[in-house]
Amino acid sequence: MSWEIVIGLEVHVQLNTASKLFSGSKLSTGAEPNTQASLVDLGLPGTLPVVNREAVRKAALFGLAIDADICRHSVFERKNYFYPDLPKGYQTTQLAEPIVGAGTVEIQLDNGEKKSIRIHHAHLEEDAGKSLHEDFHGMTGIDLNRAGTPLIEIVSEPDMANAEEAVAFARKLHAIVTSIGICDGDMSQGNMRFDVNISVRKPGEPLGTRTETKNLNSFRFMEKAIALEVERQIDVLEDGGEIVQETRLYNGDTHTARSMRSKEDANDYRYFPCPDLLPVAITDADIEELKAAMPELPDSRKARFTNDYQLSEYDADLLSGSIATAAFFEAAAKSGGDAKLAANWVMGELAAKLNAEEKSITDSPVSAEQLGQLIARLKDGTISSKIAKQVFEACWAGEGNPDEIIEAKGLKQMSDTGELEKIVDDIIANNAAQADDYRNSDDAKKKKKIGFFVGQAMKATQGKANPQQLNKLLQEKLQ
């Protein structure tokens, strides 16, 4: 029985301003609990909020990056609800007139297919505090350092049909907000958090009842949480049950989800305009200034990589998604003199090592310049591909630059044709039966059987033989 999956995302992006949205309190990761909360953040009587100009600028910059309408008369409202980490009893946010209107984000899937995901709007709002459950012996502690932190909440239309599309959309948003410099993008620190709205239906039927899975902070968890919730909803419906509109919480450690509460509608929050804040006015001059300051966007960077470096669209898409990865690749390509080799090494050996040790590219023990030097030695024939991997491992371990490692370990390819010719003659003489078998084979079989002699020669030279030179010699000698 076929089912259609319908997915929409709400993405909370923490803006990297110096201070909070409505107060002068500093934004500080790792500070002692409740040391970065001002009287304004606590909502004490007599305090008045003041809008952070830089937060408004960053929100509008995001809107321009997705080609959205920018509201010239944006209004803040109070969203009323009670929760222990919400000291004021309301959240200052936007509903009727958000700062960013409708826009679009284009994603590319693994099969090369492209799809446009519509953005309904993005609004500015303040974050709540944080509940602390450890070390309180049956009680919950409240840390209000995060209260008042500036966020933009990006609300998509329900345009995604599977987990792959949702993750691709989330990754693209991450690439955009980090590229334009409005968010640090550290998922482990909660710089981006994803709420996923999911429903299923039979083809042609109206939208089903949706659930919301909250506060996913990694792309991997998002993919797993979507698969889990889709399976749950289909099982419920196929058993004759009904989906309850609710908010659910996913546990990445156990790959389980539980119901948190029934899902509210906007009316339940009794929104009304914030009486303490004037509307935010954005002028044509403000917009033109932001457009002039717009950094390179991921799609523009991708196009440049395909045009300037002749990379495939797939490779360019992977390398342009992260500004740090893009910068590393370009530096390595410039240093090594070969963009394609640089792309292969960044996406291959380097990415594998970083993933294995759970490091980001900014923490790579091998610098872009060192990788470029390795590529240059590979390109000029100083070392073979096999030896290059050995040099890379030594460089990763901190044994020096590639040139130093190659020299210290004697890893240069054999450039003496006479010496290599003698080794080839010895191998053929010591393997006469295999040589005769090769000579009596057709061309197709010869291509396979010559591999035996190549392997023997590489073993004899400890991998230092030039593969092209070796193949040519073997073909001549085995005639």
From Swiss-Prot:
GO terms for molecular function: asparaginyl-tRNA synthase (glutamine-hydrolyzing) activity; ATP binding; glutaminyl-tRNA synthase (glutamine-hydrolyzing) activity. Heterotrimer of A, B and C subunits. It comes from Alcanivorax borkumensis (strain ATCC 700651 / DSM 11573 / NCIMB 13689 / SK2). PANTHER family: GLUTAMYL-TRNA GLN AMIDOTRANSFERASE SUBUNIT B MITOCHONDRIAL AND PROKARYOTIC PET112-RELATED, GLUTAMYL-TRNA(GLN) AMIDOTRANSFERASE SUBUNIT B, MITOCHONDRIAL. The gene is gatB. PROSITE patterns: GATB. InterPro entries: Asn/Gln-tRNA_amidoTrfase_suB/E, Asn/Gln-tRNA_Trfase_suB/E_cat, Asn/Gln_amidotransferase, Asn/Gln_tRNA_amidoTrase-B-like, GatB, GatB_C_1, GatB_Yqey_C_2, Gln-tRNA_amidoTrfase_suB_CS. This is Aspartyl/glutamyl-tRNA(Asn/Gln) amidotransferase subunit B. Allows the formation of correctly charged Asn-tRNA(Asn) or Gln-tRNA(Gln) through the transamidation of misacylated Asp-tRNA(Asn) or Glu-tRNA(Gln) in organisms which lack either or both of asparaginyl-tRNA or glutaminyl-tRNA synthetases. The reaction takes place in the presence of glutamine and ATP through an activated phospho-Asp-tRNA(Asn) or phospho-Glu-tRNA(Gln).
